[in-house]
């Protein structure tokens, strides 16, 4: 249920920085990273690209990493990822030093479970909420049930059950799930017709404006 410190990564200390050095590291299958926190000087590292991506894929960005830095163990969390806009590969990672027993603030995904009542439409307004938890006890996800929920049901962040030792940071009134009455076929047809009329009116207005400018 909770993250563990079993995500071992053997990392190397970067001896050179800059764009050129980062490109060379990525070509070698490494991910440039900076480790910071607890008042220490930022440390420039190279993470094993394949292993780090596997940790994120299987355990998520809230996974506690156990970094082996020149034989010394250091726990860390991923705080930010810089992703290539086209290739969608990790270009750089920002890591935060954490200690056993220390509490950290993180975002955790909210998963909706169950089947709402008949003739309802369910929308998830928020996909994640902020919580505070011990670094080694961050829940992988939080669940909220909509089983049998009727139209008008609204579930907020403050109504989500949290594990022991975990506290809510997000606004308790933050809307997470909204259940409304499903529109009828006639209502849907009316919405489509209204949208088409609005689009036609916008096109006509644009054509009239263009004609006026050309005169």
From Swiss-Prot:
GO terms for biological process: translation. Keywords: Ribonucleoprotein, Ribosomal protein, RNA-binding, rRNA-binding. It holds the Pfam family Ribosomal_TL5_C. Residues 1-25, 187-215 are annotated as: Disordered. GO terms for molecular function: 5S rRNA binding; structural constituent of ribosome. Part of the 50S ribosomal subunit; part of the 5S rRNA/L5/L18/L25 subcomplex. Contacts the 5S rRNA. Binds to the 5S rRNA independently of L5 and L18. Belongs to the bacterial ribosomal protein bL25 family. CTC subfamily. This is one of the proteins that binds to the 5S RNA in the ribosome where it forms part of the central protuberance. This is Large ribosomal subunit protein bL25.
């Amino acid at each position: 249920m909770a993250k563990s410190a079993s995500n071992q990564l053997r990392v190397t200390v970067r001896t050179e920085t800059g764009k050129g050095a980062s490109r060379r590291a990525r070509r070698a299958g490494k991910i440039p990273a900076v480790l910071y926190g607890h008042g220490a000087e930022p440390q420039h590292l190279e993470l094993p690209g394949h292993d780090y991506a596997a940790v994120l894929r299987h355990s998520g960005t809230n996974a506690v990493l156990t970094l082996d830095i020149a034989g010394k163990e250091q726990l860390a969390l991923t705080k930010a990822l810089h992703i290539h806009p086209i290739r969608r590969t990790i270009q750089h990672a920002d890591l935060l030093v954490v200690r056993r027993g220390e509490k950290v603030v993180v975002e955790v995904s909210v998963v909706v479970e169950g089947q709402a009542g008949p003739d309802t439409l369910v929308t998830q307004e928020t996909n994640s909420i902020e919580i505070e938890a011990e670094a080694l006890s961050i829940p992988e996800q939080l669940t909220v049930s909509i089983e049998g929920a009727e139209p008008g049901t609204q579930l907020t962040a403050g109504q989500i059950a949290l594990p022991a030792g975990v506290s809510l940071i997000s606004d308790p009134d933050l809307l997470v799930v909204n259940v409304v009455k499903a529109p009828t076929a006639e209502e849907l047809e009316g919405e489509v017709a209204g949208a088409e009329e609005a689009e036609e009116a916008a096109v006509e207005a644009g054509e009239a404006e263009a004609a006026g400018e050309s005169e």
